[in-house]
Design a protein with these regions (language model features):
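Redox-cofactor binding/interface segments in oxidoreductases and associated redox assembly factors
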Residues: 7, 138-139, 253
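Short phosphate-binding/catalytic loops that engage adenosine nucleotides
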Residues: 25, 58, 109
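FAD/FMN-dependent oxidoreductases across multiple families
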Residues: 118, 207-282
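Predominantly flavin-linked oxidoreductase catalytic cores and closely associated redox partners
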Residues: 103-227, 243
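A conserved beta-strand/loop capping segment in the N-terminal third of enzymes
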Residues: 49-99
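C-terminal helical "tail/cap" subdomain of flavin- and related membrane-associated enzymes
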Residues: 281-341
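N-terminal Rossmann-fold NAD(P) dinucleotide-binding loop
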Residues: 13-14
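Glycine-rich FAD pyrophosphate-binding loop
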Residues: 5-9, 18-41
Length: 341
């Protein structure tokens, strides 16, 4: 019998498949879309993600970056926090996904072009997409059909505006070896170096408007990028997605499907890869229910810092002070940057 049936062939699902294969489990990935899969993503791997991917034998191409720079979108005031434990890596989503899929295939993971929607489980096994396995790992993204089908999606918080992400690539040489986060009154723009001649720009916002209209809120950045757009715009959202639990019988959730706060801290991939390892460890030990607490402990810092930043972002008097405060307290800002690496 299959040990792990993984629903979803994105980074979280593939990291789980690799962890499982390295632990000696029989793993099958059900993913209806062909590789590589492109999605809206900030495309910045924090140092922790780079280290963990290397430990899995995954070699990812990209452009290193040394830290994070906050920039006031109007005045240009900036604050910098450098990583203390090695560089991060700007890598296109398609390159990352291809590298993960290649490593999984090398380890004997089987890929089937199937979509998982309905799930049936008993005390001994779970059945989905015509397959039976000991466990199902739902790594099917932000709007997880498995989570929704099992009635495990938590309702959105009232009076809290939904936020969305928009991403586009530009054929511009990176002007910095840092990921820049530009702050405007209502949105943030993330500039990630991806190659010697390419950067990615991801805008996070509560306003539903076209990418160029969003970018206009950052005049210095918009002027610098004018005429260099190289790819269509990709979008994602609403970003905040609640999950009632991470373990439901023989179904376990990982990555965005396990619940997501916001992309503000850029820590989603690190958490996904780390949680994938904990999930496999718990399953292999015969204690899948222990994964719930493991996930909560792993994600605690990410959730706390992200919620704190969002709380400040939503307050008109506090939001304009985020960058000046970071510039005034460089050691505190650097500590916060390194809290999540």
């Amino acid at each position: 019998m299959i040990d792990l049936l993984v629903a979803g062939g994105g980074p979280a699902g593939l990291a789980t498949a690799i962890h499982g294969a390295l632990a000696g489990l029989e793993v099958v990935v059900a993913e209806p879309r062909p590789t590589p899969i492109d999605k809206a993503c900030g495309e910045g791997l924090m140092p922790g993600a780079v280290r963990r991917l290397g430990a899995l034998g995954v070699s990812v191409s990209g452009q290193p970056f040394r830290g994070i720079r906050y920039v006031d979108g109007t005045s240009g005031l900036r604050a910098e926090g450098l990583f203390r434990c090695g560089p991060g890596l700007g890598s296109r989503r398609t390159d990352l996904q291809s590298a993960l899929a290649g490593r999984a295939a090398q380890l004997g993971v089987q890929f089937l072009p199937r979509r998982v929607d309905r799930v049936h489980q008993s005390a001994e096994h779970v059945t989905a997409a015509g397959l039976t396995a000991r466990y199902l790992v739902a790594a099917d993204g932000l709007h997880s059909p498995v989570r929704r089908g099992l009635g495990l999606s938590a309702p959105a918080a009232p009076r809290r505006p939904a936020r969305y992400g928009l991403r586009r690539h530009f054929t511009v040489a990176p002007w910095s070896d840092l990921v820049e986060v530009h702050w405007s009154a209502r949105s943030e723009a993330y500039v990630t170096p991806l190659a010697p001649d390419r950067i990615g720009v991801a805008v996070l916002t509560a306003d539903q408007a076209p990418f160029d209209e969003q970018l206009a809120h950052f005049p210095h950045l918009a002027d610098r990028l004018s005429g260099y757009a190289d790819t269509p715009v990709r979008g994602a959202g609403p970003l905040r997605q609640g999950a009632r639990v991470r373990v439901a019988g023989r179904v376990l959730f990982v990555g965005d499907a396990a619940g997501y706060v916001d992309a503000l801290t850029g820590e989603g991939l690190t958490l996904a890869v780390t949680a994938a390892g904990e999930l496999v460890r718990c399953v292999r030990a015969g204690r899948p229910q222990a994964y719930e607490q493991a996930w909560r402990e792993l994600s605690r810092s990410y959730r706390a810092l992200t919620e704190a930043l969002l709380w400040a972002r939503r307050r008109p008097r506090l939001a304009p002070r985020i960058v000046p405060l970071a510039a005034r307290l460089p050691r505190v800002f650097t500590g916060a940057v390194n809290l999540l690496v």
